[in-house]
Amino acid sequence: MRLPFQLPTDKPFDAVGFGLNAVDHLILVPEYPAFDTKTRLLEHKLSAGGQTATAMVALKRLGLNTAYAGRFGSDPEGQFGLSTVKDEGVNIDYVEVVPNSSTQIAFITIEARSGERTIVWDRDDRLAYKPHEAPRGFGSQGRILHLDAHDPPACAVVARDARDAGTIVSADIDNIYEGLPQLLPLVDILVGSKEFPRRLTGIEEPKAALVELQNRYGSRVVGMTLGNRGALIYCEGQFIQAPAYSAPGGCKDTTGAGDAFHAGLLYGFLVGESIEASLKLGNAVAAMKCSALGARPALPTKAELQEFMRSVG
């Protein structure tokens, strides 16, 4: 099945992303510790992440032209996080460094035997965007605008600019935020975490929740990631599901797997693939990401992704 809309071609960037960045402190342990115990860590690593920043880095590695808009703190973590985006070649003209603020951080405990993780995070309130602070003119510069829906009123400003200019709007949402109902009618491609449709609609059955999500807000493509079961899309009255792939060499860390999935999915759309093929590409990029610690180290190049797809048939 093809997308039910055309992506524009006359844009400076293939994809632009407005949303979160973060610096992750990764802590690898043999198994997740029980209460009132001590566990020696196997590895500690500082790594850059954040839903939207990671998606833009992933698309850039795949050979597309991307730009990122978001706020970094003025602390050493912020300097580190910003340098990782810049060094990948992602355009940062709309990035802001907020004086006397701390960049978003996360402490992520990863179980070595499964690769599953638990995240404890913090975000400085000074990094939040008010609607009048949204980067006007940014969203319209990409064929696709990708959002993570933090600061929904500001996201709505950027999304409205994008829609008015013919840009397709994509959103990766994992939680319910104040002002979200005003943003969602502006989203063309809405793919959330496996819990998101239920949380928003109150409907337990996944497929029924996706149908209600589309009926309520009008997104032409809706879906959810399903972890090790792949992903599910609902479009034009049809459900399309693609199973997950195994991480090459085994799963080391699931941190950022959803961000990587979105990048692979959007990559497929941007290069003209069908929804079915794009789902497989999303699952492939997510699987490859999981082969190393951190959200970004194992994100593939175009050649690496093509080789992986050949290997899985």
Task: Report each predicted region and the residues it spans.
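Conserved phosphate/ATP/ADP-binding segment of small-molecule kinases
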Residues: D161-P243
